[in-house]
């Protein structure tokens, strides 16, 4: 049997609930992060991207492995991609959180990406307030490399003004 290659809105909401239950600080990122900023699903998503407090990496991995996820790609401390037959792909990114609200993420060359505090926020989606990367953060996170066709709209995203 093939792998689940699409994560649905229902999968997303289950993953959000899972993270809320861990008590670990997190933010939704990636394609689903853009979609909740837009207030609706705009395309099909292969995975769910979550940035989280790096000091809880082992705790989070234990929770996910106990729920049936298996590690698919291990690029610690940069990212870890996991797979669940039920919920599909989950790409987690450990962030070191600073007291002033800024953060940093390890890069593949042994350095760091530095992030401003206004890259992090929350949005109301499907009856819940969900921590997510802000529009400004999404634009910065998706700069510096060539976007896939389905992601080009990220840089043109504007939010409703209501």
Task: Please give the residue ranges for each predicted region.
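Helical scaffold of the NTase/Pol beta-like nucleotidyltransferase catalytic core
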Residues: 1-28
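Short gly/ser-rich loop at a beta-strand->alpha-helix junction or flexible surface loop bordering the NTP-binding
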Residues: 24-38, 134
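Catalytic metal-binding acidic patch
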Residues: 37-60
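Short amphipathic alpha-helices in soluble, non-transmembrane regions
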Residues: 62-66
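Conserved catalytic core of two-metal-ion nucleotidyltransferases
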Residues: 70-101
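Short, surface-exposed loop/helix-turn segments at secondary-structure junctions
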Residues: 101-112
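Phosphate-handling catalytic interfaces
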Residues: 119-137, 142
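Conserved small/polar residues in nucleotide/adenosyl-binding loops
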Residues: 155-161
């Amino acid at each position: 049997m093939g792998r689940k290659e699409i994560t649905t809105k229902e999968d997303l909401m289950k993953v959000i609930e899972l993270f809320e239950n861990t008590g670990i600080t997190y933010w939704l990122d990636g394609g689903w992060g853009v979609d909740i900023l837009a207030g609706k699903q705009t395309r099909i998503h292969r995975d769910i991207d979550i940035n989280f407090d790096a000091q809880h990496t082992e705790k989070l991995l234990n929770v996910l492995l106990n729920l049936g996820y298996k590690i698919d790609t291990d690029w610690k401390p940069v990212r870890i991609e996991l797979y669940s037959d039920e919920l599909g792909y989950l790409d987690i990114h450990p962030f070191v959180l600073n007291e002033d609200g800024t953060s940093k993420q390890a890069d593949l060359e042994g350095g760091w990406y530095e992030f401003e505090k206004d890259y992090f926020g929350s949005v109301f989606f499907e009856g819940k307030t969900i921590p997510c990367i802000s529009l400004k953060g999404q634009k910065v996170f998706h700069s510096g490399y060539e976007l896939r066709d389905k992601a080009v709209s990220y840089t043109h995203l504007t939010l409703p003004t209501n």
